[in-house]
From Swiss-Prot:
Transferase listed as a keyword: yes
Family, similarity comment: In the N-terminal section; belongs to the glycosyltransferase 20 family. In the C-terminal section; belongs to the gob-1 trehalose phosphatase family.
Biased composition (Low complexity): 63-72
Taxonomic classification: Eukaryota, Metazoa, Ecdysozoa, Nematoda, Chromadorea
Catalytic activity: D-glucose 6-phosphate + UDP-alpha-D-glucose = alpha,alpha-trehalose 6-phosphate + UDP + H(+)
GO molecular function, one term: trehalose-phosphatase activity
Designated name of the protein: Alpha,alpha-trehalose-phosphate synthase [UDP-forming] 1
Species annotation: Aphelenchoides avenae
Gene designation: tps-1
Top-level taxon in the UniProt lineage: Eukaryota
Segments of this protein annotated with the region Disordered: 56-94
Length: 1155
């Protein structure tokens, strides 16, 4: 078995190396020919068992608490025959794709006790926790060479784990910490060295803490763990289940911890977890996202990390060829080290795929792992894999000739990621340029609006974006604003500059890793030149340089660091003066600062100095100005942050420059001039410039960066064509289109491209509905459920409106993705064919509506009805999903043309209410349901009318129960799905007796109306509490208010105004409605602000038009307009969003603009 595994691994790696070097796909061909190899490599069966066990635990906790363990285990065994991974692990990739297509179909299994099941066409099924996917939610799987933690083993033998503080951790931790199911794969510095492998009996006695640490450090600057401790890790993993009775006393003491046992303590219940590394990791994973170690051969790792990554790729991508290790001039050394790099990338890729699920987003970081995407795609082509390069991408001109062996595979490897993010436009432009030169068959397109390059090469497409990394502002501000830090900063200034420094004395501060890319040597040369050119600054200015030592095991680093330290000593000796005996021109320290101390130094400084030769971003400049907005800044063009600041207009060629730019760090004279300009800059100007930088950084923090990168423009979830037989099929399908439409709306609003699968999903849904219609009609005849017999009256739905909305959405996506700047106008014009009169009438009404909206310019408040106003009536309320185009138009109107927006409807809030059918993201609109008697502001802010007595609600509940019983009778059962059906609102009940198409016979309407009146009379004979109101489409049962009146939308508006402390007496108000139930809303606004109200009514009823006109004129208001259909209103709103307005978009929805 062992020899077979070794042969398999050797074969797979050989094919991987061949594919990487040649761009072929031999590995994928092997998996297709012998699928068992892939299943074995990825541990498919183990993963299947783990997920089924997870599901078993979940089912037992929520629905099987009263059942026996035997029954639960039977359930696991049964599901094991048809589990998801069993289906995924089919004989080839083509079959796996078939499964992914099948898994989107759903039905209700009566035997599942109401549990939603996924159904496969061959009859196999597996339980699910929701309608559209499994109970496993989408996770972010973060993959990096270095871990987000530091590890330390105490002398007692116990391990200590602490959260890391490096740049990568700061960038990614906010998004990772959101979900504890997120996973971080990294190398902990513990790897396999076969030459040093010990027997497991010897490993139990490893207590020597004097063994030397590994010579290299990881990318966070943390030392790699020694080999002996790596062996302990493997021993723990392998022998965790050793029975205590088989251990000797010494071994047992090691497992329990010497101190506790020798002191007479009680052995812990889980002794390994007291001291083993595995136990520490398990404990960490219980309270954080999951941290999984990636273990590789130590010899490979040392060459991969300390060799080719830092000796070749690091200096090459920084365009510092003079620091490339000379050993790589030897083709043999280059090949051997390249093979090690591929092997480590191969192991990372396998671990990532093993730990991933189909819905996960896998995020790979930095130059150590540039081949993982290519290898992972060969294992599973459906994965969504993103890559972010934290360093520059500026290889030298000879990179593709002298180092051809690795240069071309790196280019091909990066193009196999779904999305690649660069720090700056400079880096991306270089990559695109090199693609055009060295991969001539690649097709490159550019979306100017989105600023996204898409490269298609060898059948794969990759999006290239620019995502400047930032910092988590709150973490630094919290420290900077503390009294202790402020006092510490004052102490630092006094210690360095003296108790009474001269007014012109300046403290310059710089902090970075002791790396040749940071330009420390050039900085020291310029600082010496500064005093030579400006001797008047001697005795006044001090440069405080922190250069944190790392990578001293690498010769180039050690020599560079020693040279800089000597230069620092020379400067202090050269410029020492008797006139200022306590003055020291340069403070040079090589140990790091804790965050509190670092921030205190930021507060103490007058000028920050950030002048790398080349850097991906360099967050130090941002940290400095967030903490100390009154400080000056000397910044080199080698920093990615300088490029970002320049593009933001903070250092224009002609105009006010917010920092002092060093164009060439090798030009000591100009560099010294930048020092001088910063030192003598007036404090007022310096503070003004720092404030502008501060505002920019505050508006572009790390959460915006991670959100922008992780927001996908693609999805592997597609709605397939399906057969619609019963109501559940129909409503389930419509709810799934709601989810797709929500994604479309969110992506359009955020400016993320709409990928083809959204259109495919909507097109497939439309085709499914058309196929289900009666021949030659747009009418569905559906069984109430599959359990009903053939004699049951089917539900009849005229779905003409639903089909039209799908067509509009498909047109909308075509227009919105076009490059034509007039695509919005083109889409508005496409709506004219849906006008009930004519296209000319549509255009006239849009123009008239536009005049009203333009006159108002910007609305302080926007109150509107939904059904009949913003959307045409549907065949039933569960099917009245808001189209994507409508959601975008309404959200854009709320963002650009109004401040406080609210949708007020008579529908309930939830349980097939307005929130269930809306596609607008949270934050754009408030939702007032039940005529405004219950409000949803955001998930943390909901409120209701508190004036309803509890006994009245109980009375209404009795009415609801009685009507529900009535609808169980065969004669009235079809009213369940007529129109909005039976709905329980907060404060009233609605039962539809007619649909929008008048398809219910009049005698049936009269019959159910009489039955309902009989129920009301029986429960409330004197109608002291209840009041019945009939409309054309429904009958409503209201609870009377304290005054005896029915709660209406006008009172709903007043409830909102009172609760949210709105002042509607000032400013402008837009009110939209379509029926008499909306009139109280208009009247309430007119009473509060007669001249500021503008109103739009979607109606063709002359009677309603007269009522609206008279109501407005009674208040001296002439700002009203009538349109014939919701498409006109939406067209006018869309037109309003693309015109110039005089008032910007403030308020809580500003966050959407930043996104």
């Amino acid at each position: 078995m062992s020899h077979g595994t070794k042969y398999r691994d050797a074969l797979l790696f050989s094919l991987t190396l061949y594919d990487v070097n040649t761009g072929k796909s031999r590995l994928k061909e092997l998996y297709a020919a012998v699928p068992g190899i892939r299943k074995s490599l990825l541990g498919v069966h183990a993963k299947r068992f783990g997920e089924q066990y997870h599901h078993l635990q979940r089912r037992r906790s929520v629905s099987s608490r009263g059942g026996s363990l035997r029954g639960s285990m039977d359930s696991l065994n049964d599901s094991g025959q048809n589990g998801a991974e069993d289906v995924i692990g089919v004989e080839d990739e083509e079959e796996a794709q078939k499964f992914r297509g099948k898994r989107t179909s759903i039905s209700l299994d009566p035997a599942a006790a109401g549990e939603v099941m996924f159904t496969i066409e061959d009859g196999a099924c597996f339980p699910s926790g929701g309608l559209a996917n499994t109970h496993f939610q989408q996770r972010v799987i973060n993959v990096s060479n270095a871990p987000p933690v530091s590890l330390k083993r105490e002398k007692s033998g116990e391990w200590e784990i602490k959260q890391g503080s490096g740049g990568l951790v700061s960038c990614v931790d906010p998004i990772m910490s959101v979900n504890q199911e997120n996973m971080w794969l990294a190398n902990l510095g513990m790897n396999i060295d076969k030459k040093k492998m010990l027997r497991s009996t010897e490993l139990l006695n490893v207590t020597d803490d004097s063994a030397p640490l590994a010579p290299a450090t990881n990318t966070l600057g943390l030392p790699l763990m020694r080999q002996a401790l790596a062996d302990v890790l493997f021993h723990v993993i392998a022998d965790d289940d050793i029975k205590e009775q088989n251990e000797d006393e010494q071994s047992r003491n090691v497992r329990w911890g010497h101190s506790s046992v020798e002191a007479g303590g009680v052995a812990p219940s889980q002794p390994w977890e007291e001291m083993s590394l595995l136990g520490v990791l398990n404990q960490y994973n219980r309270s954080n996202y999951k941290l999984n170690p990636v273990v590789v051969q130590e010899q490979d790792y040392n060459v991969y990390y300390g060799g080719i990554s830092n000796g070749l790729l690091w200096p090459a991508l920084h365009n510092l060829p003079e620091y490339i290790v000379a050993d790589y001039d030897d083709p043999k050394v280059l090949y051997e080290h390249w093979c090690a790099y591929v092997r480590v990338n191969y192991q990372f890729a396998i671990d990532a795929v093993r730990n991933s699920r189909p819905q996960d987003f896998i995020w790979i970081h930095d130059y150590h792992l540039m081949l993982t995407g290519m290898i992972m795609q060969s294992l599973d082509s459906s994965l969504e894999i993103g890559f972010f390069l934290h360093i520059p991408f500026l290889p030298p001109d000879n990179f593709f000739t002298k180092y051809r062996l690795c240069a071309f595979p790196i280019m091909r490897g990066l193009l196999r990621f779904t999305k690649v993010g660069f720090q700056t436009h400079r880096d991306r432009a270089k990559f695109v340029e090199l693609v055009g030169i060295h991969l001539p068959t690649a097709r490159v397109t550019y979306d100017e609006k989105m600023d996204i390059h898409t490269v298609t090469y060898q059948g794969w497409s990759c999006s290239l974006g620019v995502f400047p990394v930032s910092i988590k502002n709150e973490d630094f501000l919290k420290v900077a604003q503390s009294a202790e830090t402020i006092k510490k900063a004052d102490d630092i200034r006094k210690e360095i500059l003296g108790e009474t420094p001269v007014d012109s004395a300046r403290l310059l501060f710089s902090v970075e890793r002791f790396d040749y890319t940071k330009g420390i040597k050039e900085k020291l040369l310029a600082y010496r030149r500064y005093f030579e050119r400006h001797p008047d600054r001697i005795g006044k200015d001090v440069l405080y340089q922190v250069a944190v030592t790392n990578r001293r095991s690498v010769d180039t680093y050690r020599m560079y660091q020693d040279e800089c330290i000597q230069m620092a000593e020379d400067i202090n000796r050269e410029f020492a003066t008797d006139e200022y005996p306590n003055w020291k021109p340069l403070i040079f320290r090589t140990d790091g600062l804790q965050r509190a101390d670092l921030v205190a130094h930021y507060l103490a400084m007058d000028v920050g100095v950030v002048t790398p030769k080349k850097d991906g971003m360099n967050l130090v400049a941002k940290e400095m100005l967030v903490c100390n907005p009154s400080a000056g800044l000397v910044l080199s063009t080698g920093a990615g942050s300088e490029i970002q600041f320049t593009m933001a207009g903070l250092h224009p060629d002609d105009g006010d420059k917010c920092y002092h730019r060093v164009v060439d760090v090798y030009d000591a004279d100009h560099y010294a001039d930048a020092f001088y300009e910063a030192a003598v800059e007036p404090e007022g100007e310096r503070a003004a410039h720092g404030q502008r930088l501060n505002e920019f950084i505050m508006n572009n923090d790390i959460e915006r960066w991670s959100t922008a990168f992780l927001d996908p423009g693609w999805s592997h979830l597609v709605i397939r064509q399906s057969e619609i037989k019963d109501l559940d099929d129909f409503y389930s399908l419509m709810m799934r289109t709601r989810d797709v439409r929500r994604q479309i709306v969110e992506r359009v609003l955020k400016g993320i491209p709409i990928r083809s699968h959204f259109s495919i999903s909507l097109s497939n849904t439309k085709e499914s509905l058309l196929l289900a219609c009666q021949p030659g009609t747009r009418t569905l005849h559906l069984k109430p459920s599959l359990e009903e017999d053939e004699q049951t009256e089917p539900a009849h739905f005229d779905i003409a409106n639903e089909l039209d909305e799908f067509e509009k959405d498909l047109n909308f996506m075509k227009f919105i993705q076009s490059d034509d700047v007039y695509n919005v106008e083109q889409f508005i014009n496409s709506l004219q064919e849906y006008h009930p009169v004519s296209a000319d009438k549509f255009r006239d009404e849009v123009i008239e509506l536009g005049d009203v909206l333009t006159e108002a310019d910007h609305f302080n408040f926007f109150f509107t009805d939904r059904d009949g106003t913003l959307k045409s009536y549907s065949c039933s309320y569960p099917a009245s999903i808001q189209p994507a185009y409508s959601g975008v138009i309404q959200a854009q109107f709320a963002r650009r043309c109004a401040q406080t927006c609210a949708i007020v409807t008579t529908a309930p809030l939830m349980r097939i209410g307005v929130l269930d059918v809306s596609t607008i993201p949270e934050g754009y609109y408030y939702f007032g349901a039940s005529a405004g008697r219950e409000w949803f502001i955001d998930p943390a802010n909901k409120f209701k009318d508190q004036s309803i007595p509890e006994e009245d609600l109980e009375l209404l509940e009795r009415v609801f129960a009685a009507i529900s019983d009535l609808l169980e009778e065969p004669k009235f059962k079809h009213f369940t799905w007529v129109g909005s059906g039976l709905q329980k609102h907060y404060g009233h009940i609605t039962i539809a007796h007619q649909d929008a198409f008048n398809s219910v016979p009049r005698h049936q309407v009269r019959a159910i109306d009489q039955k309902i009146k009989d129920i009301i009379h029986r429960i409330d004979p004197d109608q002291h509490t209840l009041k019945v109101k009939e409309t054309e489409t429904d009958i409503k049962i209201f609870l009377k208010s304290e005054s005896g009146e029915i709660f209406d939308k006008g009172q709903g508006i007043r409830l909102l105004v009172e609760h949210m402390k709105c002042d509607i007496s000032n400013g402008t108000i837009l009110v939209c409605g379509d029926s008499s139930t909306d009139l109280p809303m208009l009247q309430a606004c007119l009473e509060a602000n007669p001249s500021g109200v503008y109103t739009v009514w979607v109606t063709r009823s002359d009677e309603l038009k007269t009522t609206v006109r008279e109501l407005c004129e009674r208040f001296g208001n002439k700002n009203f307009v009538f349109v014939s259909c919701p498409e006109v209103l939406l067209g006018g709103m869309a037109q309003a969003t693309i015109r110039e307005i005089s008032i910007g978009r403030p308020g809580p929805r500003a966050s959407h603009d930043s996104e």
